[in-house]
Amino acid sequence: MSNQDALSNTMYDILNAMGKDAEFLYDTIDKYIKDAQDANKQYLVDTWQKIKDDKLNHVSMLKDALEKEIHGQ
């Protein structure tokens, strides 16, 4: 495997950040939203929903960055 084929530090960083955001989105955030709903705390529902929306945006940004890394831009 040539050095160019190896996973670069920047590509690793992107994948690592995507993994952390994805784990939070798919394993955690909906439970937090439900807990806030069950506690009848709309301000927390809104807060967690905003965080979820932001994380989804971050994942999209990281996906775009990863595509640029893959294509050498």
Which residue ranges define each predicted feature?
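Iron-associated oxidoreductase/ferritin-like identity signal
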Residues: 1-73
